[in-house]
Amino acid sequence: MRVACVGGGPAGLYFALLMKLREPGHDITIFERKAAGSTDGWGVVFWDDLLDKLYSSDPRSAREIDQAAFRWVNQVVDVQGKQVVHANGRGYGINRQRLLDILADRAQDLGVQIKFDQEVMAPSQLPEVDLIVACDGVNSRTRLEAGSFQTDMHLGSNKYIWLGTGKVFESFTFPFVHTDSGWVWAHAYGIDAESSTFIVECSSETWTGLGFDTMPPQDGLSLLEKLFERHLDGHQLIGQFPDGNAPWLNFRTVTNQHWYEGKNVLAGDAAHTTHFTIGSGTKLAIGDVIALAENLQHHGKLELALESYERQRQAALLQPQSEARLSAQWFENISRYIDLKPHQFSTLLHGRGSPLLPHLPPPRLLPAPPGNGGSHPATQTPQTGGTEGESDLQPTRAGVSRRRF
């Protein structure tokens, strides 16, 4: 099979190497618009469930990712200097460029051709192939030009900026700071021994009130460094652009009624996005391409394979999309919860995946005192982009039981 992958992110690279592992005779080319060694963003976060999938699919690249990943432990919620530590949280962060390098090297070792600096504006630019896999992100040109996928895009109301810093956060940290214009907070986690991802978020009203809409980008970074001075310990905030700046954005939630048309198929952010506050983007993109590769192997006809892939992945996305929507809404309504005591606020932050939160007064959502019948159902199974509730001991890849969260 001749395959063109548009986009050299984790989804495109992993799909290509999986196809080569299944059938070395496949002719697979990745077209990546950026130069080799350049990427957007800083690092990505993930948990054992993704690492288990990687080990099951390709142990060699999984070991490299495992070895390169930064392991953070615990979760810290810091509201104006008052901290609540959740000791049941742990996960992984990895430098995005390091992740791409591992996957690109593995794909090329297997015979995949990667063409950098090759922007594909429309499928008609591509050579004649049997399958075009659109892994070109939320702004997918392939999705726009290839057919009617019935795409829907919803713009979140909060503003956010994706930054990096030399401060290494050993725990996944949510610092909340109050300003005269409202609350500003961050999602911070280590990605290697020298740096962390630091995503800043606030309401549009706070963003405008603080002047981010008019001040030069470098002045904006300086203001953020001042606001988070206590958490950064003197370290700078750095943007993704060569000049060190980065754009403020509104998150775009993308859904598609159809994931394929003819020989064109969507995967990763081109097919769907889930709000960054649940930290599932990379996991879901990898899940897409694992399913796509499996269906292409198991079905003799392309249309049957793509139909089965679409059905499986749309069903798999229902729960994380719901959790992401609720998580985004929780942060968009931060004023509803922020005046609670820090431990109460932290409890609801970790339980924000509950559909009850928007509809009941916050005090009714909190766990009942001991002896009063146990905890409220809204907080029995915390779900967040940084934590989940502790479960029973389960076997790991090494065969040693440990708690998952």
Predicted regions and their residues:
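Conserved mid-domain beta->alpha element of the FAD-binding
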Residues: C5-L21, V133-A134, P247-L326, W330
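Conserved N-terminal glycine-rich FAD pyrophosphate-binding loop of Rossmann-like flavoproteins
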Residues: A35-K53
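Extreme N-terminal starter segment of soluble prokaryotic enzymes
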Residues: M1-V3
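Glycine-rich FAD pyrophosphate-binding loop
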Residues: K20-G41
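Conserved FAD-binding catalytic core of PHBH/FMO-like flavoproteins
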Residues: D105, Q118, E128-F251
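Conserved N-terminal helical subregion
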Residues: D48-W162, P367-Q383, R403-R404
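C-terminal helical "tail/cap" subdomain of flavin- and related membrane-associated enzymes
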Residues: V6, L21, A62, Q67, ...
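Conserved Rossmann-like nucleotide-cofactor binding loop
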Residues: A11, A36, N139
